[in-house]
Amino acid sequence: MFNNLKAINERPKPFQYYTAAELWTDEHTSKKMLDYHLNEEIDVSSRNARFINRSVSWIIEKFNLNNKSNGLDFGCGPGLYTSRFAERGINVTGVDFSKRSIKYAAQIASSKNLKVNYINKNYLEYETQDRFDLITMIMCDFCALSPKQRGIMLNKFKELLKPSGNVLLDVYSLKSYNQREEIAAYEFNHLNNFWSPEDYYCFVNTFKYCDEKIILDKYTIIEKAQTRVIYLSLIHI
């Protein structure tokens, strides 16, 4: 038991493990994430609806987007931004590797007769011959990538942008980093069965890396049939 607890509380290296796919593509957690996305009153998986509406208006004005503009949203989720861009006449593509979120986004676009090109793919692997006036990565997606992955995306931005194109990222600030504290906590059925529909025990460890300005949340999920570990690393800029 002592060795098990020691392993649970062990501090990994920043971005040593990449488990995003387990969070976004798992049948159960992807449904939970979609529920968070669609709750317009909270800022969890997405910003609240009022913030999104203001942001879309600001983005369109800031970058002079119109019905001749082509936009690309990496990590589009259920289309909260892409659908609003399409409603304003912008040609938009959304890429996300959550099959559930893309399916929902496509259904909404169809019901509203919106022309949005949705692609179910890991954006690290996305390729196209199309070129774009604006590329967005919203809700701090860029911060969840390792240095190598960020390099891949920067090269992808350069490749996919038109000569006069722009990139819009939102990122976690150093103020946000300073507000976080290291913790070690334990909870039965953590976050109201977020990790599994069955009973489980969850150990939560938050680690801070001062030199790199990284926050790493480590979730050790102990179920009757298996034990899983999910790592969520976020760099603050």
Segments predicted by a language model, with ranges:
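Conserved beta-strand signature within the Rossmann-like core of class I S-adenosyl-L-methionine
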Residues: S164-V171
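Conserved class I S-adenosyl-L-methionine
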Residues: F2-N66
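A short acidic, Gly/Pro-enriched loop at the edge of an enzyme's catalytic core
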Residues: E127-L134
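Conserved SAM-binding loop of SAM-dependent methyltransferases across substrates and taxa
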Residues: P78-R88
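A short glycine-rich, Lys/Arg-flanked "PGG" loop and its adjoining helix->strand segment in the class I
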Residues: G151-P163
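SAM-dependent methyltransferase
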Residues: L174-I235
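Conserved SAM-binding strand-loop segment of SAM-dependent methyltransferases
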Residues: S111-E125
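Conserved SAM/SAH-binding beta-strand->alpha-helix loop
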Residues: S98-R100
